[in-house]
Each structure stands twice: as structure tokens, then as C-alpha cells.
């Protein structure tokens, strides 16, 4: 090779090196490290590093990596209180079982209506005006990631693990333009912390989280579901409810909302938004056609939605729990106001406090607790009962005189002014003998608030739901039936009717009028008709009360014999003639 050729070769080599270096400097950049896989089910379609969404504000990540799962998977989080089953398809809740409770068919109570949700969507589905985007986010396969603080803080694939609180579970979906992330944190109680965010490009978009298909015990009859299911919303100080039957069309209730959700007779599912001023509450009914149901029977479950009004993450807590005063009072803010004892809450709620004390400290049987509390109530009312019986005996003494006055005016019509004169004469007799005509009614009047209070307490307190007493009485919140040869016999109602009859037979009556006496003796049959469909705990209360009064009346009759009737005054006798 000559010198010129060598120079040309060296020049070419030098220029090649220079071009290579310049190309590297100006046209090539350092490739980023390969991102860590979120789970074996994830498939990353880009080498860009994963961008984490900002916790606050409306700005979303600048870059959105593609992050989608390969196939639907199920993930279960289970504690002593609940078992929640998630699906990675849509990052929704397919089942939320309250482990300590059974439904009407004696199966573990699932608050999610699975068959309805297969058609209508599952809890934690998102809703938004863009139908295509809504479908994409509810049908897409999310990538799950779990974090257990007590195990070193390393994220792992939850599909291959059994999760138990304390744990957090995050689902992420992205197609490169749209990203959705749902994060759930679980603790030892009934509260689940949730964070749902959807971003498009570099901006968050408003999102609504829904609970379709209704809530509660779905094994009840359609009539019971329709009457017992409510939407509840507002604040703990000012709570509003709307019956499911009253929801005719989609309604959005504006904030501020401290709480919003659904409830049935014994269970509640409540959203507690972190920012009450930035949410609304949406209610609607959904058409659902179960197999083998007629058009008339076709149910229309209630759907509830927590609406985010701002383009920002939607942060809230979910409380899916029994409507127990103790459980709901432990929530922050306390939710015990959800337990509605009705107009007689001032009696029903205080009645439950000693009843629960007796159950927890004396005897672990709700039926015997009712018996003991009833004995205590009747013992406390004994002085009033004695006073009432004394008043009844005094009225018996003057009964012939009263009868003479009534016979004197028996031909007078009701609208005749002389009827007023008759009443004045009767009241004069009572006054002369120091008798209060209403005195004998006091015990009955005092019993009525307790009766209604017990009714409301037994109808609302979840502690008495499926509570066993003895033998055939297995549910104090349900009517008493002993099934013999396929026929349900209301044994407690029969015993109550007999006891009430004997109690009235032993109690002196304040009247000698045969028609009124017959009417009073018919009262036990009226009570039987009234109590036939009531809870067995209610019948047990009245039966025990009647038995206690029989014992009391036995000793009263021995030590307080009835007084002899006064002779009819001559004036009354002459008037009769």
C-alpha cells in the first residue's frame, strides 16, 4: 500500500470515528432501564419508565405506559369479619360476604347480588359520560399489585397469594392514552379505604363509582326487598332516606355529603367521601330480567353512585357492615344514627341497653335476656299496678250506683243535652268517693310504650336476628312456628292467649256491665290476632309479662280481697223505677 493510499485509509478511518462519535452525541440518547413488571400477568408494550399518578390536583402523569393484564383473575381478601372477591376484569368486587351472618336461606350473607350484577355491572364499576371509555374501563383487564406493610413493604403479585389485612391492593389499567387506577386498603374492622382515579393524557377526568344490583340480603322475597331497602345520605347530624320504591327515575343529589349509600333492614353499605364538598350521590333503578320471572315480578334493583364533581382522584372509605350500634358507633364519624328505631326510639334504644347488658353479663341467650328484662320491668311497675287495682276495687264498689244512673238515662239519645247531665252525675259519684276513673287504666297505658318499644327494638336490632331461644324458637326476630306434619303451629301465641285470659279472669274489673265484661274477655283473642305475625321475641315479652302479672295477682287477691259493693242510693233506685 503506497503513502497516498495509507493517508486515504487513515483519513477515512478518522472520519468514520468522528462521524460515529458525533452521531452518538447528537442523535442517540441513553436507553432507559427496563421497567419492573407489576405482575406475571402484565404485558408492557413500551420501554418508557412507569409514571406514578400525583395524589392531589388535576394534573396526571406526563407519560402513560401501556399496562394491561393477559386474562381475568380473581383475588380474595379475607379477614375475620368479611371475605371480598375482586376480579381483575374491571377491577370490580364480585362478592362481599359478611362472615358472621347468614342470609334468609342460611347461606353466608353476600351483600353483592351476583346474578343481577352479571347483567348490570359489579360494585366499583366506573361511570362516565363517554360510553366507549366507560365500557373500556369496566371490561379491561387490570394489573394487580399488593402491598403488605408487615412483610418488608415489597409489592407482589396477589393472584398467587392469599391476602389478609392489613394489606393494600392496587389495580392499574392503561392503553397508553387512558389510565385507570383503583387502590384499596384493608384493616381489621369493616372499613375499606378506596382511591379511584382516571386520567386522559396529562389530565385527570371526573369519575363516578357505582354499586349496581342492589345491596343487602338478596334471598328475601321481592316484596320484603322493595319495602326494606333504602338509600341513605347526608350527614350524621341530618340523615335523609329514600325508599327504593320511591326512586322512579335517575336522581343526582348534590353535596356536601358526609355519607351516602344503601341499607336494608339489618345491613348497610356506606360511602364516606374524603371531600364531602366535591361529591354528589346518584340514585337509579335498573331493569333486570332473571330467568323464570314474569314481567310483573321482574325486579328493578337500586343502583347507587358516588359522583366525583372535580377532575381529580375520588378518595373515600366504604363501610359494609351490620347495623349494630356497637359496630357503627366505632366508625369515624359514628354511623349509629343509621339504626332507626322510629318514633319510639326514646324507649326502644334505652330498652336495648339493659337487654344487651343482661345478655353479655348474665346469660348468653337473647330469649332468656328478654324474659329477665320483662320480669324486671313488671317488678318496677308493681306499685303502680297495686294502685290501679285499688282504684278498680273502688270503682267496683260504686258500680251499682253508676249502673243506676246509666239506666236512668238509657233512653236518651247521644246528642241529647241530658247526656251531659248523666256524665256530670257519674263524675260527682266518683268525686264523692275519691275515685279517679282513669286510675285503673294506668298500668295498661304504661305498658303500651314498652310494648311498642319492644316491637321497634326487635324489628331493628340485628343482634336478635336469627337469635335462638329454646327448642323450636330459633329466630326471635321471626314469627313463632312449630311445624308439625307440615303445619306451622304458633305455640307461643297460643300460650300467650291462654295466659292473658287467666290474667284478666283473675283481675277485678272496674265495671259490672255484662257487655263490657264480655268485651274485656274477648281481648285475649284480639291479642292473638295481633301477635300472630309478630316476632317471637315480641310474643315472648307479652307471654312473660302475663305470667308475671298472674303471679302478682294471685298474691294481691290473697292479701287485698275485693270490697263489697255499696247499696244503690234510693234516688238512683227511684229513678230507675
List the predicted regions and their residue ranges.
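Soluble non-transmembrane domains of integral membrane proteins
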Residues: 74-337
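General structural signal for secondary-structure boundaries
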Residues: 4, 62, 66, 78, ...
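Intrinsic low-complexity, intrinsically disordered segments enriched in polar/basic residues
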Residues: 27, 34-54, 60-64, 134, ...
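Juxtamembrane extramembrane loops of integral membrane proteins
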Residues: 25-116, 171, 175, 573-577
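Helix-loop-helix
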Residues: 1-42, 86, 195-197, 211-213, ...
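Aromatic/His-enriched, Gly/Pro-containing loop or helix-boundary segments
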Residues: 4-7, 44, 160-162, 174
